[in-house]
UniProtKB/Swiss-Prot annotation:
Keyword annotations of the record: Cytoplasm, Glycolysis, NAD, Oxidoreductase
Catalytic activity: D-glyceraldehyde 3-phosphate + phosphate + NAD(+) = (2R)-3-phospho-glyceroyl phosphate + NADH + H(+)
SUPFAM superfamilies given in the database record: Glyceraldehyde-3-phosphate dehydrogenase-like, C-terminal domain, NAD(P)-binding Rossmann-fold domains
An individual GO BP term: glycolytic process
Amino acids binding D-glyceraldehyde 3-phosphate: S150, C151, T152, T181, T210, G211, R233
The protein's name: Glyceraldehyde-3-phosphate dehydrogenase
Site positions per UniProt: Activates thiol group during catalysis: H178
Species, as recorded: Hypocrea atroviridis
PROSITE patterns, per database record: GAPDH (PS00071)
Top-rank taxon: Eukaryota
Subcellular compartments: Cytoplasm
Self-association and partners: Homotetramer.
Organism placement in taxonomy: Eukaryota, Fungi, Dikarya, Ascomycota, Pezizomycotina
Amino acid sequence: MSIKVGINGFGRIGRILLSNALEKPELSVVAVNDPFIEPTYAAYMLKYDSSHGLFKGDIEVDGQNLVVNGKPIRFYSERDPANIKWSETGAEYIVESTGVFTTIDKAKAHLNGGAKKVIISAPSADAPMFVMGVNHKDYDGTPTVLSNASCTTNGLAPLVKIVNDNFGIVEGLMTTVHSYTATQKTVDGPSGKDWRGGRGAAQNIIPSSTGAAKAVGKVIPAMNGKITGMSFRVPSANVSVIDLTVRLEKAASYEEITSAIKKAADGELKGIMAYTSDEVVSTDMLGNNNSSIFDIKAGISLNPNFVKLVSWYDNEWGYSRRVLDLLEHVAKVDASKK
């Protein structure tokens, strides 16, 4: 089964999606669209990455094509998704990774060019959200536009699922200590409604809002209204960490909670949830394929019903991996419906 993929937006996530797709034999990226760069510049940015290093493969440019490991990838430069001729390359599954077209109405414009399904690599206000290992099996082939939620929701939801399934969560608060992203400022500048967000990203720890915790309630309905959270944007280029503090229904020692997480990570959530007892720091998680890596030694329990859990995630690499996993899952479900 060969799944032909198109990528709209060749920013951080778009480029890392392409790099990851090359490791998946069932996926073939046949087209990329980005109106702000030329193919030669796209090739340069794909080859050299300040966080993930030199691209492991061959990259060339042939007219309007990128040629990656000998395979041509058509490069478009359309501002309006409705004008991208995905059908020219046979691209049926489109990853919408611009961060702009995140509603059903905006993202479905890709269907005009021949796309079959659109997966938004960001949270969406109205598209159904799916998180691998949590609710991906709920996909029934019906939606034409769906969301892979956020990197933080992907890091948080598997952890919440394990804890709630085993011990029950009464309520919880999450803080993500999050690396800065492209939307932030390198030096102080205007930032509309979010004044703190306009301060220099490399100089400050910046409190910020996040909908990631509330979004868990959309993929785990039992958690709706029970978890919320916030973010601290910190002077780090990549890798983030979740601090989840929960009150449990069923009393449990920290060791029992750890045992439940390890069991799930070695079983049903293998490749999505992982764990470590090493004395790790953020850079040790660069390029980690998992959605969430539970740090056994970093958590702490106040009493058997109140515990803090810590879990790392590569907010670029691990998240991009899940987008592609979801795409593969969607394509297989779609094929089974024919």
